[in-house]
Every structure is written in C-alpha cells, then in structure tokens.
Amino acid sequence: MNIFIRTALVSLPCMAFQSWAAMTPATSPASLYHYQDDSPAAITTPAEETKQPSSPPVLPFYGDEARARGYDLPAPFGVNINYMNIRQNISVDSIAFSGLALGSIPLDNLFKINVGDTRESSKTETVRLDVWVLPFMNVYGLVGHTKGHSVSDIGVGVKLGDLGEIKPDNLQNLKFRLDFKGTTYGAGTTFAGGIGNWFALLDANYTQTRFDILDGSIDAFTLTPRVGYRFTTPGVDALYLPAGKLNVWVGSMYQDVQQEFKGSLNDLTMPSAGLQEMVDMANSKGKGRFDVKQHLKSPWNVLVGAQYVITRNFNVTTEFGFAERNSFFVAGEYRF
C-alpha cells in the first residue's frame, strides 16, 4: 500500500530553506564575521555600499562588533513564503493488517500484500518567520500545509491456512493510489560563513506533520550543506531595478524520516472492487488497522540553486533537486 509515501512530504516542509553569502569586510580582511539573509538572500554587503541605520538594532547579538569590522548586516527579522514540489521513489519493507475477523474467527494474517515500485508526489506551502540571533546564526519557525499522493504497484495474496496462499488474478498488478494532506510545523537554524564572495551554509531543521489518514504525527530531520558564490548584478533602469546581488550554489539534502506508519483501514480505499469487498467483510466491526514499514531509496539528493537580492528588504530564491529525489523550490522573502 502507498501509505508510506507521506515520509517524503514531511521532508519537504522540513526544508525551511535559507542561504547566505559572506563578503570580505571593507576593513580587516582577516575578519571571521559573516552575515546573510534568511534565504539564500543572506548576503553581506560592504559597509560603503549600504548606509547603516543611525541606531543599530539589538539583534543580532555581537552585531556591533561585526559592523565595526566593516560588515553590513541584514535586517534582523524575516517573513518567508515558500512553495516546494517533491517527487521521489520509496521502498516498502512490509505491510500488515490487524484487527480483522469473520465473526469470532481472527483474520489478521488473511492478506499478504507484495509491493513493487512506489512513487510519491507532494506539494507543500509554508510560511517561515526567522531572526538573526548572531551575525552567523539564524533561527526560525515554520508552519505549512502538505498535499499529495502516491502510487504503488501491488499484488495481494490470500492465506488459507494449511492450504497455503492463493493469488487471485483480479488482485494482481494493481495500482494503489493514496491521497493525503496534513499540517506541517517545525523549527530550525542556519549557520553561515564565507571568504570574499565565496560562502558556505549549513541548515538543520526538525518538523512534524499530522496527516489526515495517519495516527499521530510524522517526524523528520533535514540537514542541508551548501557552498556558493555571490555576483553583483547591474541595475535595469527600464524595470526600475537597482543594482543587486545574485547568489548561486550547489549542495545536498539529507532526510531522516520516521519510517513506520499506522492508521485505520476505514480511512483507505482499496484499488479494486474485489479487494475492497474482502477487506470490508473482514473489517465488518471497523477495528481493522494497518502498519506500514518503509525506507527512502536514498536519504541524499543533489541541489542547485540561486537567489536574487532585489533590494535590502526583498529577495527571491529558487532551487532544484535531482538524483533519487526530484524537487523544485521557490520562495519570496521580506526582511525588516
């Protein structure tokens, strides 16, 4: 069954995306302080390029020291709206039903479900609020909504005790589709540093997603290292765009997602009328449960992205993922 697919979607919201760029200070080239915006927009600008406010904000802590070294720090607070689309393959280890019976006869071992290829697709929209607590450290919280589906190739066998297992033709080569939706929330932090126009960042976050067809929540941990370079872009008078910054990077995303899912059979729709009738008969009391164990075919994928810093207060970001997990990410951010 395709219940396992939800893991993928968790991971997608768990990616509270951010990126940063550090610039060598106008003075003291040996400085180790680097700062950036919440998204890859976090780019440091030399002090002479941007006028600092007359009364520097309290955050980030040690911000005065960074400014004294010639760095222009981004506004401390940010609001980010993100959209992410993920498609990935999943391997299912086992699917088990329990709580089934025909009268007083238990039928927990009646069905044997063999699962082939499984493909999951999900879309997640999130809103993230962040704050720079240190010139090189950003923390954030996020909340969002995930919606998607999975499709699995399955074959169902029926166990007949000492008679062995039969595989009815009408229960083989089925396409099992599972639709799901849920709310995702979480928190994370990003560390950044750089030399000249080169920058490196490390993002880590933890999320929980509550799905409409699962018991409890699904937990996910995501770790994303990135390395990139910052370019200065000319202004475009015809579009009233000032000179900006363009950050490009490569990276990788690691996902560790809870791999066991449980729920009620009443929330599932079987892929064929024949199988649905058999499950309904064995689950006449409505106590049937499912338990799915699975794992991602690959916890890592490759990322390529870019961020355009339009003004000091606004930037847009996009990122693509490929290899075992295909993903598309786009975000707009306002800093204040």
Regions of interest found by a model, annotated:
Residues A75, S121-E125, D179-Y185, D215-L223, ...:
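Residues that define the transmembrane beta-barrel architecture of outer-membrane proteins
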Residues F77-N82, V139-G141, W198-L202, L223-P225, ...:
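Transmembrane beta-strands of outer-membrane beta-barrel proteins
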Residues Y83-N89, V143-H149, G193-N197, A204-R210, ...:
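Transmembrane beta-strands of outer-membrane beta-barrel pores
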Residues G70, I81, V127-P135, G141, ...:
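Residues on the lipid-exposed face of transmembrane beta-strands in outer-membrane beta-barrel proteins
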Residues M1-P57:
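Cleavable N-terminal export/targeting peptides
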Residues N247-F336:
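Outer membrane beta-barrel transmembrane domains
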Residues Y35-L178:
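Transmembrane beta-barrel domains of Gram-negative outer membranes and organellar outer membranes
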Residues R67-F77, V131-F136, G193-A200, T232-L246, ...:
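Short loop/turn motifs that connect adjacent beta-strands in outer-membrane beta-barrel proteins
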